[in-house]
């Protein structure tokens, strides 16, 4: 596969993630868009690692590290969303400002 095709795919995924993160009003959807952004970055890491440096696996190892961090971020984010839903009965971002009492 050519480098340009993979980079265009990654740019599309990144753009969709940014658009969804900006326009999302639901916390779960915002977390999903953030994961989409991180996956686009992982595609770039693996692509550049394969294209420019075949012998060293720095991009591959770094993408595995990003996947592990993203999994922890998703678990913590979903736990926070679950806690907010239990207290506020809503997962909408604009209704969950916990600093206003």
UniProtKB/Swiss-Prot annotation:
Gene Ontology terms: biological process: ATP synthesis coupled electron transport; photosynthesis, light reaction
EC number: 7.1.1.-
MF annotations from Gene Ontology: oxidoreductase activity, acting on NAD(P)H, quinone or similar compound as acceptor; quinone binding
Gene3D superfamilies from the UniProt entry: 1.10.287.3510
Pfam families in the cross-refs: Oxidored_q2
Subcellular location, record wording: Plastid, Chloroplast thylakoid membrane
Keyword flag Cell membrane: no
Membrane-protein topology: Multi-pass membrane protein
Stored PANTHER family: NADH-UBIQUINONE OXIDOREDUCTASE CHAIN 4L, NADH-UBIQUINONE OXIDOREDUCTASE SUBUNIT ND4L
Family annotation (HAMAP family): NDH1_NuoK (MF_01456)
Protein name: NAD(P)H-quinone oxidoreductase subunit 4L, chloroplastic
Lineage: Eukaryota, Viridiplantae, Streptophyta, Embryophyta, Tracheophyta
């Amino acid at each position: 596969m050519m480098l340009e095709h993979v980079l265009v795919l990654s740019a599309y995924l990144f753009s969709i993630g940014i658009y969804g993160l900006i326009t999302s009003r639901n916390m779960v959807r915002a977390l999903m868009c953030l994961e989409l952004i991180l996956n686009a970055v992982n595609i770039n890491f693996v692509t550049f690692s394969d294209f420019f440096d075949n012998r060293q696996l720095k991009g591959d190892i770094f993408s595995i590290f990003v996947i592990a961090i993203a999994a922890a971020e998703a678990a913590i984010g979903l736990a926070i969303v679950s806690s907010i839903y239990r207290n506020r009965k809503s997962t909408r971002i604009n209704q969950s400002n916990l600093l206003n009492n």
